[in-house]
Amino acid sequence: ALTAEVSRGRRVIDASGLYVLPGIIDPHTHLGLAVPFGQELESETRSAILGGVTTIGTYFNQPGSYLPVIDRLRREVSQLSRVDMIPHSALREQQQIDELPLYSRQGMNSFKVYMCGVPGLYPHQEDGFIIRLMQRMKQLPPTAHPILSIHCENTSICDYATEDMQSQPLDTLADWNRTHPNLAEGEAVRRAAYFAREMGVRTYVVHSSTREAMEALAADKHPNLYVETTSPYLCLDTDSPIGAYGKMLPPIREPESRKALWDGIRSGLIDTIGTDNTVLTAGEKQVSSGMREAGAGYPTLGTHLVSVLDEGIYRQELPIEKLVPLMTMNPARIFGVYPRKGTILPGSDADLVLVDLRAARTVDPRPLLS
């Protein structure tokens, strides 16, 4: 409780003229895809904390049961992470659905499926699998607040589009965009929204990237449906001069889609801003091999907050009060860690970020420690 007596800290920071924000929550990261989880956990959470991100949601992925690895993952997070973590588990097999109650008892209540997979990493799941998973989630205790993240792209459309591009030039971000068309995301978002409504399961649409997705969500937004976009989609488009460094899944989109995402933030359609952080070194990215062979994804934790504030405040002319809840309070509420996280209240964790909106700096990757 607040009292008249406040003890003096060991260090006093003069925050005059600065914004004091709750620690930023990035609900969407991937760690341990190319190297062991513990190795990336140490480097990327170090970069996160330097960028003002104090809590991350990380999507774990493996075949078979998660039960044998939960204790190891918990131990690695405790020993190596500089930030707190919200665990999400990607599900791909019936055994994992059967074990949901056991995962829930271990504190894993956030799950994920891919309507369109990532070759070599994540298989796609058929609609029947998703419905069966939702049915099982409804049997979990309501106090667990289970939630299902869905990667929304129509896998058949993406497969055909990718096949068509095999005989076409694939040199630019616009070319890469054509392998995963906007249509594929718009259609899949409509399905996910319908499933969430009919099944009564809290559903989180990850990394929304297109105008078509915004139109679909605006037509069927309901209390069980939450919408995420990411800082790369808000700050970059197919006209950005970054070449294969910008290769992602889903792709960075055309300027019209980027505008639609900012309109979604203005209207309140979008609930959260994450990163979809994926760690690749320059060598692993293989940019020199061209767009077709380059790896998808790149690390963004260290520049996430400053990118959103720079673009949102100075180019989109939005107040900071409009942006901060999408990176603090909203993800905290959605993933069940509010009010411990996402706000500055008596009893909340003292995760604080000081922001100087007057400072101008050029991004240098060396201090980011990723």
Describe the residue ranges of each PLM region.
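His/Asp/Glu-enriched, well-ordered alpha-helical/loop segment
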Residues: D171-R191, F195-G200, Y245, S267, ...
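A conserved acidic, glycine/proline-rich C-terminal tail/linker
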Residues: D364-S370
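Alpha-helical scaffold segments that flank or form the walls of functional sites
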Residues: L18, V35-P87, R92-N109, G128-P142, ...
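Histidine/acidic residue-rich metal-binding segments in metalloenzymes
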Residues: Q95-I273
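Gly-rich Lys/Arg/Thr-decorated short loops/hinges at beta-loop-alpha junctions or inter-strand turns
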Residues: I25-T29, L50-T58, Q166-N177
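Histidine-rich, glycine-flanked metal-binding segment
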Residues: A1-L21
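Divalent metal-coordination and catalytic microenvironments
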Residues: G17, H28, A48, G52, ...
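Histidine-centered catalytic micro-motifs
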Residues: G23-A34, L148-C152, S208, T275
